[in-house]
Amino acid sequence: MSKISLLDCTLRDGGYINNWEFGTETISETKRLLEEAGVDILELGFLRNEPYQNGRTVFNSVDQVKALIGNKRPGMQYAVMAEVANPFPLEMLEPADDQGPDIIRVIVWKTKRNSQGFEVDALQEGFLYCKGIVEKGYRLCVQPARVDQYSEEEFVAMVERFAELDPMAVYVVDSWGTQNPEDLLRYMRFADRHMPAHISLGYHGHNNMMQAMSTAQVMMKENFRRDMILDASVYGIGRGAGNLNLELIGKYMDEQLGTDYDIDPMLEIYERYVKDIYDMEPWGY
């Protein structure tokens, strides 16, 4: 059976709720507790070309990310996210090393509006940006936003194009949480058929139709010929209706797959930090 990994995006996607202003204690303790929980990949925030603010999970240098990482937990990988629509300049990106993030995940869009207001292709721009990330020595995860925009032919062409960069993973991203499991599985199968088997397949869902958990369960039972990565966050904290709940999918994987995620630290994050954020700015269906 292929390996299924858990990526926690609490400090990154969760930041859409509070403008990434978690505070220094919440950030450091959330990181520590997620390390205790044993998630496979820990996403720490965004790389953006904007002023850095202490206590906020938006970074404008790799050195700031390194300071948060500190001593890496053996066997765990650390990630940050960048966006082609608001790119962190590649000339400001330090080459990868053992102390910094292992992975940079890049949000790419199918189209964009040009200066005249016309919709134009954006994938070539995304490809070149991702190519620059790889050339700096980072592992790349390609996050094509809103897969529902793509026809089968367009999606396959996109997957084959980005596979040329030999990324760690290409994702199926349900940006607005509007796709049912059958639709998302269709895109997953397209990707599975058209990528080399060593490239992982990722799923990033939102819970607008209360289907993030059921979709993840369906995908886990599919006989893909590659490893998978599932994105999740504590109590589903994230944009809109929120994400796949880390504590729920972790418990399910422990029971069904024999993984060894520790759920108690995830619940501690909720009790100490996420609950207060939810009380001020709730998310969910």
Residue ranges with predicted function:
Residues M1-Y285:
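Catalytic cores and adjacent flexible loops of soluble metabolic enzymes
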